[in-house]
Amino acid sequence: MSSKEEHMLEALQLAKRGLLTSSPNPMVGCVITHNNKVIGRGWHERSGENHAEINAIEDVFSNLGNKSKEALKESELFVNLEPCTTFGKTPPCADSISEYGIKKVYFGNEDKAQQGFSKMHPGIEVESGLLEEEGRKLNRGFFSRIEKGRPYISCKIASAL
């Protein structure tokens, strides 16, 4: 497993922390690295509150203090879902990523509800599809709502002979 996949796997693990609290939003986790060392972590804790990317950036400031802005300019961000580009209950994460000059963003899944991160912020290097299948599985309810306009439905049947 490559270091990129390890960082994305950690982001997916962080995302799972929002299982019971992030709805109706998807479960999202984020890891920020500098020289391949993790300097910030975050996840989307509750609807209407900071998204995973913002929590991870705040964690960088908590960990590095006055060295944070310089470190962020040389950093890579790993997030399981494409950063948001629209203003809802919170400002767009894409704007903060751009503002701090993060050099590269890796995300697992595209968010069809957004306007396209790479189109909105062309100066940032982007790589998508990292552990895409794992991310789709984690947020299958969200993707069903966005792509099919209906909830994800599973059915269990038990029978006795």
What are these regions, as identified by a protein language model?
Residues 28, 73-76:
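Residue-level recognition of the N-termini of beta-strands and the immediately preceding loop/turn
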Residues 43, 50, 54, 77-98, ...:
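Local cysteine-cluster metal-coordination motifs and their immediate loop/turn environment
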Residues 59, 80, 158-160:
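Generic beta-structure capping elements
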Residues 38-46:
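A short, conserved beta-strand element enriched in hydrophobic/aromatic residues
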Residues 1-21, 35-38, 64-69, 73, ...:
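Zinc-dependent deaminase
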Residues 20-23, 27, 48-51:
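A structural motif shared across PLP-dependent enzymes of the aminotransferase-like
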Residues 27-36:
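Short beta-strand scaffold segments in enzyme catalytic cores
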